[in-house]
């Protein structure tokens, strides 16, 4: 065993990798679920509630909610917001550029996608 492997790298078992994969799949499915709701008239806060409900229905918890004081399940940026915007009641408008970051914690492992 090399010095680096002994002190810095923890190899994952096939079971751990399967759990990590499911955590990521929960995020993927969540993003697919809310994508169709990013339309004029809806708000980021509506998407956030829907995402939290779905993640919890998958026996996972929202990965960002409460992490470093984060108050939401999703981080949503609109237009001029660079990254990690908090969901608000700002109504989506035609032509908005929307970025969504989502995470889940499933059986001790995080899935994350931006």
What are these regions (language model features)?
Residues 2-114:
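Active-site neighborhoods and metal-handling regions in enzymes and metal-associated proteins
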């Amino acid at each position: 065993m090399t010095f680096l492997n002994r002190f810095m790298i923890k190899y994952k078992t096939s079971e751990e990798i399967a759990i990590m994969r499911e955590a990521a799949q929960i995020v993927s499915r969540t993003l697919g679920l809310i994508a169709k709701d990013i339309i004029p008239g809806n708000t980021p806060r509506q998407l956030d509630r829907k995402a939290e409900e779905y993640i919890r229905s998958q026996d996972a918890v929202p990965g960002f909610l409460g992490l470093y004081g984060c108050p939401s399940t999703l981080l949503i940026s609109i237009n001029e917001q660079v990254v990690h915007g908090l969901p608000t009641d700002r109504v989506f408008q035609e032509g908005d550029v929307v970025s969504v970051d989502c995470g889940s914690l499933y059986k001790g492992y995080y899935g994350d996608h931006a």
